């Protein structure tokens, strides 16, 4: 094995020097604490000479009760990390001034740091809170530690900051319906998000997969709608928030100047509620909460007056818990097929004089009727409605605020129609359940790609609206955290951070003051602050250009190149040990001439490592082709009915065959029994296809598939056992001689992690090692015997 080591030790030395330096105080100064690290970037910042040093007995001066409350909050935070006795008095070295005459926006502040004093001035308690958050970000990142840190000089560089936000609405969406968040997990996010001046949490409390709020008049919502039976057969729940827990969380958020907006989905995405009270749907058939992802066809029936009575009663209880201005009513992804055949819905359309207008069907306008009627009811409580951009398909009242999620178009249409809009488009990076790196090695996600840079570079105000003077209708921006694939809170945080911090800067900082390169630098400081709160944030993984793979075959030699989604050091070992801060640093592609194990990880300036990738490198000889006589195009397939979660369960059946047939395409493995949107009453089965694959030329080939198993030449290449069958994350390569090779493909129809394997297309992909893209194995490559 020959490893290219050019400038390796020089780079290692530079890394160590840049990471560590000394101050006069004798404490080691961390590189991530250098410079100004405030997120989001302030509107105006002037650096000055000197610094303010915290010392034991420091006092925070505040006179009004509102200012004293904020002073007490930050005194506790400072004391927790420093161990200092931090007093709250009328006067102090740190002073909080509420000045009603100050020329600030309601959330604006001035922060003046000198060597002898610190003063925060604002016209509202909210402004004081944000000013103190900025002061804490001038201090070393360890100020957010959960315990005393003794080897830090607690100094803040002298500076003058004048600051206010770009947008009044700066939101993060959280979804406990698909996967629940405990009260403590919600509070943890509130603590962290408030550090970066996020002021709104959109709380998605109801959906097809779960109802998460106690409604006393309808106890079945929580007791029945709050639980589901997963595809694996286990019960999930019952999980929901009691009204007392809701009050506690809302109060906790308000103390940190975060408003919580509840979402009650209407009239679609409510299968959990319908499961508890079947009469809410058109047919009234008994159902259970959805245990798979996607859009449910069974929705509420707007033809029944009892549905509106139900919704109004639920709203009565919810508005008492959420004192904010807005109430989110959903309105998205509502299939209307059942309304077309429902006599009561058609009667409602007739009675209300609803008629198609050339742009909208009667059913779309019936949807608008629901939105308007609920909007009017909420107006009795002085609530303004927010709805997803589908509500524009009808004619919503002009007071409705549109949440544009399918792109900028919804926000543009809203503004042109006189509606305010909140920009939250998935295609533009604001769906944080998207991948943030190579899908081959990142945890399973819904799809898409939303890197930190993509989130950061989003501009919520389309140029079109600026040109016509309608940009004032864009009142804010929000990132969404749909939780289908957030199986626990660690995964949730892995997706939320640090991209939520990029969103915070998009929402607060004027576009002309944004600088992504500097943001990348400041993120290193923010990482340590997140460490203080125990946040499991994303660290970019070492990726192989063209698609990562942990099993590499070669015949003569192979060169492995690595990159990351943003600049970061990589360290590795070749002896099977785990890499660490003292391991060799990757500087150029690594060449291998014999078998080996490469362990490689990303290394932050704080010394924290990413997940370690273990890559098996194997020297192989070309697997000889086999002679096949009397063959036909296609594969032989055997089908066994039943649901098998894994190969062990399948093998226990003795593989009794119910159907023997032949197929022309690999996709027929997953389509033998048609799947449905709901997967109700679909007969599950396992299928094994055997035959041969015709390899066009000698070489090393990578195989990729979402099937359970892919065998080539008697070797198991792709093994997706026990995993969510999406995005083919277990690729493997093999050296093959030109010609025929045995092929076995295994499909198990089941639901794991909310995803039915039946929804996959059954395709098997391959690429030669010198090719950049995978290609589908086509029917002309498949052969079978009689």
Residue ranges and their predicted role:
Residues 23-167, 491, 507-517, 521, ...:
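Contiguous, structured surface segment used for ligand recognition
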Residues 1-34:
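Bacterial Sec-dependent N-terminal signal peptides
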Residues 39, 514, 520-648, 652-691, ...:
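Short, compositionally stereotyped local motifs that mark structural "simplifiers"
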Residues 385-390, 395-400, 405-558, 565:
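Flexible, acidic glycine-rich loops studded with aromatic residues
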């Amino acid at each position: 094995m020959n490893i290219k080591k050019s400038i390796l030790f020089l780079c290692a030395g530079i890394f160590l020097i840049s990471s560590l330096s000394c101050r006069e105080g004798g404490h080691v100064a961390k590189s991530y604490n250098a410079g100004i690290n405030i997120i989001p970037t302030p509107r105006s910042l002037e650096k000055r000479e000197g610094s303010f040093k915290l010392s034991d007995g420091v006092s925070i001066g505040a006179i009004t009760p509102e200012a004293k409350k904020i002073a007490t909050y930050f005194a506790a935070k400072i004391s927790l990390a420093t161990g200092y006795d931090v007093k709250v008095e009328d006067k102090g070295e740190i002073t909080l001034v509420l000045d009603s005459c100050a020329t600030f926006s309601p959330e604006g502040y001035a922060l003046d740091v000198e060597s002898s004093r610190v003063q925060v001035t604002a016209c509202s308690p909210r402004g004081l809170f944000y000013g103190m958050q900025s002061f804490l970000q001038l201090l070393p990142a360890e100020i957010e530690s959960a315990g005393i840190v003794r080897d830090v000089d607690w100094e803040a560089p002298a500076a003058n900051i004048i600051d206010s936000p770009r947008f009044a609405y700066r939101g993060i969406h959280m979804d406990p319906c698909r996967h629940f968040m405990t009260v403590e997990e919600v509070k943890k996010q509130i603590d962290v998000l408030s550090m970066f001046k996020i002021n709104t949490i959109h709380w998605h409390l109801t959906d097809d997969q779960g109802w998460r709020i106690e409604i006393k008049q309808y106890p079945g919502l929580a007791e029945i709608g709050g639980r589901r039976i997963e595809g694996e057969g286990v019960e999930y729940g019952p999980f929901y928030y009691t009204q007392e827990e809701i009050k506690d969380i809302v109060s906790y958020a308000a103390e940190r100047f975060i408003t919580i907006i509840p979402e009650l989905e209407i009239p679609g995405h409510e299968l959990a509620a319908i499961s508890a009270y079947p009469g809410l749907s058109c047919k009234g058939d008994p159902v259970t909460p959805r245990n798979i992802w996607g859009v449910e066809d069974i929705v509420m029936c707007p033809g029944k007056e009892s549905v509106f009575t139900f919704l109004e009663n639920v709203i009565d209880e919810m508005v008492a818990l959420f004192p904010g201005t807005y109430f989110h009513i959903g309105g998205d992804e509502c299939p209307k097929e059942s309304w077309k055949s429902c006599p009561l819905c058609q009667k409602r359309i007739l009675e209300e004089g609803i008629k198609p207008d050339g742009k909208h069907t009667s059913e779309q306008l019936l949807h608008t009727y629901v939105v308007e009627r609920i909007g009017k009811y909420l107006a009795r409580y002085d609530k303004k409605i927010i709805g997803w951009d589908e509500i524009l398909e009808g004619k919503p009242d002009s007071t409705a605020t549109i949440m544009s999620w399918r792109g900028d178009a919804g926000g543009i249409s809203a503004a042109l129609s006189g509606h305010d809009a909140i920009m939250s488009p998935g295609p533009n990076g604001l769906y944080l359940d998207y991948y943030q790196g190579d899908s081959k090695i990142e945890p399973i996600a819904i799809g898409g790609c939303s890197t930190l840079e993509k989130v950061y570079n989003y501009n919520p105000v389309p140029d079109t609206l600026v040109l016509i003077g309608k940009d004032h209708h864009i009142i804010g921006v929000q990132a969404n955290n749909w939780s289908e694939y957030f199986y626990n809170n660690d995964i949730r945080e892995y997706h939320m951070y640090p991209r939520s911090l990029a969103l915070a800067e998009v929402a607060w900082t004027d576009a002309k003051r944004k600088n992504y390169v500097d943001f990348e630098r400041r993120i290193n400081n923010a990482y340590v602050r997140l460490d203080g709160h125990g946040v499991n944030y994303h660290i970019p993984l070492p990726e192989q250009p063209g698609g990562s793979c942990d099993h590499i075959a070669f015949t003569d030699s192979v060169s492995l190149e690595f990159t990351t989604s943003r600049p970061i050091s990589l360290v590795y070992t070749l002896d099977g040990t785990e890499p660490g801060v003292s391991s060799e640093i990757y500087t150029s592609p690594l060449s291998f001439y014999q078998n080996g194990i490469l362990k490689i990880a990303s290394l932050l300036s704080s010394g924290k490592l990413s997940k370690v990738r273990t890559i098996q490198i194997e020297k192989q000889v070309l697997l000889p082709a086999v002679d096949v006589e009397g063959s036909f195009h296609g594969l032989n397939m055997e089908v066994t009915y039943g649901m098998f979660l894994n190969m062990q369960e399948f093998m226990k059946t003795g593989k009794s065959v119910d159907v023997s047939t032949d197929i022309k395409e690999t996709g027929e493995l997953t389509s033998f029994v048609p799947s449905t949107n709901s997967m109700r009453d679909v007969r599950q089965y396992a299928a094994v296809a055997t035959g041969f694959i015709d390899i066009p030329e000698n070489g090393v080939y990578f195989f990729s598939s979402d099937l359970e198993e892919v065998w080539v030449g008697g070797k198991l290449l792709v093994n997706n056992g026990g995993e969510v069958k999406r995005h083919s994350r277990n690729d493997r390569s093999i050296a093959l001689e030109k010609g025929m090779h045995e092929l076995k493909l295994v499909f198990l129809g089941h639901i794991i992690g909310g995803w039915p394997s039946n929804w996959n297309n059954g395709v098997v992909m391959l690429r030669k090692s010198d090719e950049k893209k995978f290609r589908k194995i086509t029917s002309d490559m498949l052969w079978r015997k009689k």
